[in-house]
Amino acid sequence: MKTLLIHSDYLEFEAKEKTKVAEKTDVLNGKMDECLTVFIAVEKDDESDPNAVVKNAVEEIIKTADNLKVKNVVVYPYAHLSSDLGSPATAKEILAEIESELSNNYEVLRAPFGWYKSFKISCKGHPLSELSRKITTDRKEEVKKEKVVSKFYIIDGESQNLTEVNDEIIAKMEDKRLLALLKHELEIKEEATERGEPPHVKYIKEKEICDYEPSSDAGHFRWYPKGKLIRDLLSDYVYNLVVERGGMPVETPVMYDLQNNAIREHADKFGERQYRFTQGGKDLMLRFAACFGQFMMKKDMYLLPKHLPLRLYELSTYSFRYEQRGELVGLKRLRAFTMPDMHTVCMDMKQAMEAFEDQLWMGLKTGDDFKTPYAIIFRFTQDFFDENKEWFFAMAKEYKQKYGKDAILEILSGRKHYWVGKVDMAVVDSFGRPIENPTVQIDVESAERFGIVVHDGDKKVHPIILHCSPTGSVERVLCGLLENAYLNTLENKPPALPTWLTPIQARVIPVGDKHEEYALEVVNKLRSSGIRADFDDREESMGKKIRNAGTDWVNYVVVIGDSEMESGKLTVTVREESELKKPKKESLSVEELIEKISSETIGAPKRPLPLPMKCSMQPIFR
């Protein structure tokens, strides 16, 4: 913020004409005698912490006014003091807050924002009558006083013991996934080793799933047909999961106007990692989650207690986060991503806690379905935890009984976010680092900020809202799946995706030309049964065809020669049951193969293979 403070005999103004960002006001003219006139330009940096810049500006104005023994203050917006202006919405709020704070001890006149104004001023002309000041968002000692402190515990749900984490506890931990998550939370750095790229980065390129798009911004991907199929199947999976549990799908914009106070305040809580830009005189942002559109939609709804809990779901395609370039890592951390996002409106905390528990189990189910085990951490403010210990311990006990695992508990001394409780579930990658995926959060702020109300008789109640991503971003889910596939190789298992997610579930390879007609019949039977099957008709050796099927992670490789045609039994290599150098082969009829694959994919979403059936016709994308 830039300010120009003038000790004035008087300041007089008249608002002449509106601009596009003019505030609504009845104060179109005014005059104040014997005053301190404060010309103010709100800058972009002020948006990172509006409360701090208001506090610091008020302190500076009070100090100057007291030195000059002045009791009258004019707050005058003056954009010409800076070439790096903040958004109009931020400026209006900051100026209004400054006026409000000063009004406790001074007579204050504030000129309207966003109007062309004429003004007359008489400067007293003494050595302290003209002062310029740059106001920053520095909080000085206040930050230290208000710092929220965390304590971490290991919770054994069966015994319901809480053990505070220390070096001895860390040294004794046997659950490697939970230990990796705990070290990440405690910011314990491992000894530096030459690791290179995570395995999933190699896989996404080698398997023609996706790749960096060099002509876009860093952290944006192009998706090839196989990758698009996987992403669509994952999206279908989450859609079915939430709709079965009462979620109502919606779609909202990806771009929002920061002049809306609620939008800006919610965006500011996320910090600087946003795509923001100015277009047509408006300060705009690209969403980093579906909160904005869903909250604006809920604000316009006429909600009654009987409607609750009310769940709105959106597959946020895309969401954007301006991560630092040096932090961008494959599908784990990127700038444009697909986020399944459900928000649940709850009447009160009791209903919110019931929904939280339901959504915890829903999130854990996704790990079961993907075969990617999670480590989990609960996070609660001290007050919330003290009030709801019995509920938490019952939930932790059920988790231990179902999964046989301990969990981490973080207790925060106060609230530093919009939530009072949350749970995060993480896959651990091949480098021993967590990939946080599903999350559930109890939000106690946003309903009031966005004006969301429930009509309960004559009362209007601000509800509690749960944020839930049942899987985390689709890209991170795939990241976890691929990292888990690599970890399988360390246990002498071939890397693979779950059958329902594998682009090519079955490949039929004829030994010779005379076997092609029968092989095509088999392929067509598989495809007509909803199985993604292709046919390797390339002019290559049998050995290379089988190796290619392995490279493509085909779940079932069917070889057809004389004996298969004569017996009607197919020789099938089953990838999931094989070892790295010891393929597991079975003799199955076409019907038995169809039944085997169908049993593995029962209840899972299905889509056809988006590639030509014949391998010779499938293009190479990279």
Swiss-Prot record:
Protein EC: 6.1.1.3
Record keyword Zinc present: yes
Record's keyword terms, sorted: Aminoacyl-tRNA synthetase, ATP-binding, Cytoplasm, Ligase, Metal-binding, Nucleotide-binding, Protein biosynthesis, RNA-binding, tRNA-binding, Zinc
Cofactor list: Zn(2+)
Pfam families, sorted: HGTP_anticodon, tRNA-synt_2b, tRNA-Thr_ED
Keyword Ribosomal protein: no
Cofactor note: Binds 1 zinc ion per subunit.
Enzyme class: ligase
GO biological process: threonyl-tRNA aminoacylation
Region (Editing domain): 1-136
Annotated GO CC locations: cytoplasm
Membrane-spanning segments: none
Superkingdom, natural source: Archaea
Intracellular or extracellular location(s): Cytoplasm
GO MF assignments: ATP binding; threonine-tRNA ligase activity; tRNA binding; zinc ion binding
Record family assignment: Belongs to the class-II aminoacyl-tRNA synthetase family.
Free-text domain note: The N-terminal domain is an archaea-specific tRNA-editing domain that hydrolyzes incorrectly charged L-seryl-tRNA(Thr). Catalysis of tRNA editing is performed by the charged tRNA itself.
Function: Catalyzes the attachment of threonine to tRNA(Thr) in a two-step reaction: L-threonine is first activated by ATP to form Thr-AMP and then transferred to the acceptor end of tRNA(Thr). Also edits incorrectly charged L-seryl-tRNA(Thr).
Protein name: Threonine--tRNA ligase
Origin species: Methanococcus maripaludis (strain DSM 14266 / JCM 13030 / NBRC 101832 / S2 / LL)
